[in-house]
């Protein structure tokens, strides 16, 4: 999909006049008319150079030959020029590092007037760096035995970050096992005698306790350590042991650390600052030459603050080609700590509704905790935009920052101007966010004025994030997303690259549905509405487009997250044509209250868990979701059923990573940054889609299938030198049908090549699978590509010794004493949820008399479901689906052990059950009949047998019954293979 020129241009349908006007205004952010008009008008740029540059002079003309010496003077002159309102104003920054002693603040006085733009940009060929850090020099050995060096950096300041050779270094820390300590309402008691030395440490109030939990990553500073008692600072400890995923009751096994003591400095790459003495300690990494190290010690918490007031916002400002770097964020080291809740939000201050026994009574939520939600704070960004309009960041880099890279329209607490929200028509294009403590971009606030503003000018609207790269960031505040937007009206997140993140890739929405009209039943039960209104109007969150993004390797550290994550109602919003690969958990995650979203034509490859999941528990209103035409390598989807809760779920396709359809290949190729921002060719995302199909997909021994390779050019350029080859395993034959493609493919064109694939005449196993591989070589531009695809052909030896029946599509095979059933089926079971008798069976007709034993070994099971079943069966007539009585099975499952099931009322359905957990294939199973009674047994070795459950009486049992092998995949429409051996009836 090509990027739309504006956040919400739609290819089909009519647009209202008001909407058209809004789109045209937003489009101006991308058109960048300022530079062109300035040239035409002959307006001279204001040129500035870093401090100490030769010929730089604040009293000079501010030209390339005699640039200004300070950014302050450049800003003063830009303000004066902008105030005239006659032309665009450009400030050019020459190459070098501009070390700030205080943040740059841009307000209404810095704004472009009369439709003109004020641009702060890199001079041609320059890479200017705005830094809040100072370089560290003068290293000397501190401890030769441990390889620790030190440098004097000046006393009287603190920092939580050090950047070495362009990467954040790790503060000195030790790991603390959960068994080393006992958590208490005031801190913890040391249980491990090896930690007794903690009581002797100096500067104890500067020591941090970190708890890495499920979806929260928490920090609290120490107050004191005496003997084995550690007392933590307040309210940090109270707030971190309050609510959900709390330190004392995490949702998964926690990891604890103590940080920031000289004594902890024992690993290469760690550092410690003695702020009183002004001494920095560092232990170099292997191979790191301390004399060549580039170390930057940050002193500022923010670099650029763009914002005016709602009456006089900052306007018409553009920042282009700049690098923002070298900040810290000190708040987590205060007595507040970082009582993290989710995605950069944290509890701040003393909580008046916290009960005295909250350490136990509120460790997994309580009514008092609900009172905190409306006052949660947000992490402050290094670059901040609020109360501002027509602001653009283009081709810029945000790196080595102590918190979030760029905050747009966050709450007032996260803006140094003291005015939050109110960000309109802000665009971030072609920029890079990496190697920082916090997430990349955060749009919107989380407090009441963010979702139900008391002043309409507070609404965040018309935000565009496009062609950016956000990767390997949130290195300290692991709970933060690469891109996160809470409450915003008209937001486009298009064609960004997101990768290597600890938590979610792209997160949209906040509030868990509690602030939507009518509220949330779950939060009614929790008591939230005793502390806030139950709103009857929608929030400001609507009209969001998440389109064409490439998201990979996310959810690498934390949990309860996905490639794309949503919360609450987001009317008129779409998630389309994104490519998600290698998520550590989910693909699409529709969390509490997610509504009114559609997700179409996305590709999910290698998600560790479901490709899509909706949290619709506890009465929340999650629903009204549309999922159409998506592709996934993991078939699992939960909480989303077509026709339930207003959901539409159809035409989604499970694909093989080695054989993706051409349409999926196009989506993969087009995902991520576009045009000049696309970057180097990616061999994993080639401009040619190649897919293999087989007709039929399964053959008999000696049979043939037609395999077709379809090659489609999904790019806008020509593919040349196309060549296709196919290989098959030994014993199989491949014969080309027709002539090969000898020409290239124009943009959008496709071609096919076909082969006849023939299986060997017989096999030594019931089922043989052959990997048919196609290799396609071609060139596009100056780059050569090879695309490999494969599919599996299944060939079955004929079933000759037994009969077969399938109540659902099934195939059967045998070789020697081994058998295979390939079948699907919802289940073989009847209860209140429904009556199911869907299976495949091979059997001997009327083989079991009144005294009979049926035995077999289940050798193999596809894990189509934990309750898939394979084993032995007795039934009057195994072809009498849903009607024949005398029905009993003894089966093995992939995830629930073995089960003896029987028809207790003679209606033709299994309805009674006994089981033993922990048993998997291979395992032996047996049914023993004596008159009208049947018993089930299992064995792990074929000699020692264990009875399962009671002996069952089967009403309507016949004198002679069919006996055989039965299987069901317990997954409607999903075929599994089930193997058997040593079948016998006696």
Protein language model regions, located:
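Extracellular polysaccharide-degrading/modifying enzymes targeting complex plant/algal/animal polysaccharides
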Residues: 47-387, 392-399, 407, 414-422, ...
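Short glycine/acidic-rich loop motifs that flank beta-strands on beta-rich extracellular proteins
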Residues: 102-103, 301, 328-334, 380, ...
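Right-handed parallel beta-helix
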Residues: 315-326, 365-370, 389-400, 420-438, ...
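Short beta-strand elements of extracellular/lumenal beta-sandwich folds
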Residues: 702-717
